[in-house]
Amino acid sequence: MLKESEDIEGIAIEGPWLEDDISLEEIIKKYYLKIGFQASHIGKAIKIWKHIEEKRKKGDEITVFFGYTSNIVSSGLREIIAYLVKHKKIDIIVTTAGGVEEDFIKCLKPFILGDWEVDGKMLREKGINRIGNIFVPNDRYIAFEEYMMEFFEEILNLQRETGKIITASEFCYKLGEFMDKKLKSKEKEKSILYWAYKNNIPIFCPAITDGSIGDMLYFFKKYNKDEELKIDVANDIVKLNDIAINSKETACIVLGGSLPKHSIINANLFREGTDYAIYVTTALPWDGSLSGAPPEEGVSWGKIGAKADYVEIWGDATIIFPLLVYCVMK
């Protein structure tokens, strides 16, 4: 009934013995790789990212692309990303409009922990928006609008002076510069936009109008009867692809899926794929969506290199990413 088994070698499955004097950090660093299931994927991600960090410290040129969806910034992961940007642990950012605007809004007023099970009609009547179990009152967007109208005026005047339409990445850089001028240091010290501006780390946002920024742009153009102000996304795709092409090695770290994920890995298609990839996602592959596409699918397209070191962690990024960053950076 049982066939004779072959001898196999590898990592023996083992967990921590909690009677030992052991910290949570030691459990994650020493045992996660050996526990199995998604813990082992977290362990592998730590190993890959540590390897990238060690090579960069030695002077190896590895361009780190980092992508995330707007809900990541809605959550407390925003401050962790700002830390990475401040300390130049990532080189290129790709996000959605929400990932830009919510970073700015949080410099003005905080988002509030709410609940998943709340009547939507009641929240609507109270002027409170819900992102999962995070509440965002409308006054946050009103405060944001006041700043954005002034910012759009600056961008329009710059466009008139130079005769040049700014790209979405230049828009994000200028927004960081605008924050530096207008906001107090305490308000901006945990901002992704601010540190990206200070460290000259480009933020690409191919869908810059898909969010509150787009709403504000609509109001600005309608109120001012403006037909001049434009944002160029075409030249950004050249810039993003060229960065990938001209990099000796690349690494792609992506939280979530959608547009940021594909923009990053598609840029790496032009160099026969990235050398390292870490995905953190809850999306499933069964509907053929890009969000759920596993690394192996990226290999088939040439977006992830055939010899790349990669891992996909299936789970909530708000749980996984703080552990991952702490174990790599501390």
UniProtKB/Swiss-Prot annotation:
Entry EC no(s): 2.5.1.46
Active site: K303
Cofactor: NAD(+)
Alphabetized InterPro entries for the sequence: Deoxyhypus_synthase_arc, Deoxyhypusine_synthase, Deoxyhypusine_synthase_sf, DHS-like_NAD/FAD-binding_dom
GO process annotations (BP): spermidine metabolic process
Root EC class: transferase
GO CC, any one term: cytoplasm
Pfam families cross-referenced by the UniProt entry: DS
Family label: Belongs to the deoxyhypusine synthase family.
The name this protein goes by in its record: Probable deoxyhypusine synthase
Naturally occurring in which organism (per UniProt): Methanocaldococcus jannaschii (strain ATCC 43067 / DSM 2661 / JAL-1 / JCM 10045 / NBRC 100440) (Methanococcus jannaschii)
Gene: dys
